């Protein structure tokens, strides 16, 4: 099959799009937002020249949908939407996109019923890692710190701000060897949370993240959602895939998907964060054991090959269905590991060849 992706987000370029190519599908990735700004006609030209079976997008387009959805309707090409901003932007971004899509995937299980209340069939598809990209590499002295955080300052989200207070602030207050990488919003004193220049490590290209993850003793994690049973930061899967020792704020999704002190470590308070960092900095062998376990676990359950299977199997089901034939549900076992099963959907083999 032929898939045209409209986003150059790493979860596509190094994730789902990359993996579909590895599985033998034909994939083209364009920056539809940039293209529409330069020349609105270029989108229709790209679609016509590639002639995709499906056009796929993630997140949200804003006004771009006003341009591209009429093109897809004229050409009879189905649209696939991965609502990667759920649940935070369900109403403002996801729902308008989903209403114009034939297949909808969400990272937040709790949103599935919300879609169904709007007559929209939705499937669960979490973030993941790509072992062909997310793996350990040669350490770099630039990132040889006790603790690092890679990400942007989204302190406008209450859960994210809470995580900063639990994970970052106590380490800053105790003067640990910590570097924070991301956009320079971190230095803006008008934000609800900011850091001093000596803590800021600057911007970091996505291709350099695995080097940073392979070099630091502890990689820190924050999440913008702390109420979802499934939605967590994509960095969780990526850092574990790179063999990092990952210490993160606790959320229900982290506990549902992973085991504490086995795959990663979570903290529920500033005091616990300091205690965990002091404990594991003094015990490199334990850090390495947990990091190996975490990498093995995501490689076994949470790669984009797993997601591509879920994705391709969902495309074998009718694009429009009743409330009773929808995709995914979840149960929690005694170890708090979430296990997914597909209801009334026949599992089919992935077609490894182009048509």
Write out the residue ranges for each language-model feature.
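C-terminal amphipathic helix plus adjacent low-complexity
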Residues: 279-355
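Active-site proximal beta-strand in glycosyltransferases
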Residues: 72-85
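Catalytic-core regions built around general acid/base machinery
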Residues: 67-75, 96-97, 167-170
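Membrane-proximal helix-turn-helix segments that form the acceptor-binding/catalytic region
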Residues: 87-102
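Conserved acidic donor-binding segment of nucleotide-sugar-dependent glycosyltransferases
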Residues: 264-270, 279-284
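Nucleotide-sugar donor-binding catalytic core of glycosyltransferases
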Residues: 1-46, 50, 59-67, 103, ...
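N-terminal Rossmann-like NAD(P) cofactor-binding module of classical short-chain dehydrogenase/reductase
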Residues: 56
């Amino acid at each position: 099959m032929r898939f045209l992706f409209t986003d150059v987000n790493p979860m596509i370029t190094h994730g789902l799009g990359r993996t579909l190519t590895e599985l033998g599908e034909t994939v083209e990735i364009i920056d539809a937002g940039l293209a529409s700004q330069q020349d609105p006609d270029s989108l229709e030209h790209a679609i016509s020249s590639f002639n995709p079976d499906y056009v796929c997008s993630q997140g949200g387009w804003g006004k771009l949908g006003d341009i591209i959805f009429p093109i897809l309707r004229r050409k009879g090409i189905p649209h696939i939407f991965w609502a990667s901003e759920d649940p935070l932007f369900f109403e403002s971004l996801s729902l308008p996109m989903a209403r114009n899509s034939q297949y909808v995937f969400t990272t937040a299980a709790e949103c599935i019923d919300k879609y169904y209340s709007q007559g929209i069939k939705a499937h669960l598809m979490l973030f993941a890692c790509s072992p062909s990209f997310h793996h350990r590499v040669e350490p770099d002295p630039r990132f040889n710190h006790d603790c690092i955080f890679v990400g942007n300052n989204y302190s406008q989200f209450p859960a994210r701000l809470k995580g900063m207070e639990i994970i970052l602030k106590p380490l800053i207050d105790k003067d640990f060897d910590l570097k924070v990488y991301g956009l320079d919003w971190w230095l803006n004193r008008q934000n609800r949370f900011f850091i001093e220049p000596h803590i800021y490590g600057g911007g970091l290209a996505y291709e350099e993240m695995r080097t940073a993850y392979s070099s630091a003793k502890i990689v820190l994690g924050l999440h913008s959602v702390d109420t979802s049973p499934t939605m967590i930061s994509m960095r969780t899967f990526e850092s574990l895939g790179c063999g990092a020792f990952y210490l993160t704020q606790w959320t229900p999704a982290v506990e549902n998907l992973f085991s504490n002190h086995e795959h990663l470590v979570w903290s529920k308070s500033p005091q616990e964060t300091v205690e965990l960092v002091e404990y594991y900095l003094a015990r490199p062998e334990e850090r390495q054991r947990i990091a190996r376990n975490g990498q093995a676990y995501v490689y076994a359950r949470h790669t984009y090959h797993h997601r591509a299977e879920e994705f391709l199997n969902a495309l074998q089901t009718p694009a429009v269905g009743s409330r009773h034939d929808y995709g995914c549900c979840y149960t929690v076992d005694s170890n708090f590991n979430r296990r997914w099963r597909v209801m009334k959907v026949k599992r089919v083999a992935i077609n490894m060849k182009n048509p």
